[in-house]
Regions:
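Extreme N-terminal starter segment of soluble prokaryotic enzymes
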Residues: 2-5
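Flexible nucleotide-binding loop
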Residues: 96
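Acetyl-CoA-dependent GNAT
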Residues: 10-11, 17-18, 22-92, 103-105
Length: 108
């Protein structure tokens, strides 16, 4: 496929927030947070998430259509540890390999 995969930055905050809210609304039981909680958060919260996490976005013709989020622990004995805290692909592109591409890019 012709996806572009890259790390999301502060300039992507509106698209990131929209996709995150879509994910929370579509798959309510799959995430630790809720649509209602995240909907009430200011945009600065999402900017901070982009800055403190590695969040890769998958773009299709310039539209953010998928993402994967990773948090690396910061303690001196824990820097080698991290966790994937979320992944979402827009339903129209599910099953097309974007999730695998995001996972592969993150693991490299």
């Amino acid at each position: 496929m012709g996806w572009q995969i890259r790390k999301l930055v502060a300039a992507d905050v509106a698209a990131f927030r929209d996709l995150r809210l879509e994910a929370l609304q579509t798959y309510r039981d799959a995430f630790g947070s809720t649509y209602e909680t995240e909907m009430s958060r200011p945009l600065s919260y999402f900017v901070e998430r982009l800055q403190k996490n590695v969040i890769l976005g998958g773009f299709d013709q310039g539209e953010l259509v998928g993402m994967i989020g990773f948090y690396q622990q910061s303690g001196p004995k824990d820097r080698h540890k991290g966790a994937i805290w979320g992944m979402y692909i827009k339903s129209r592109l599910q099953g097309g390999g974007l999730a695998s591409a995001l996972w592969t890019r993150l693991s490299n």
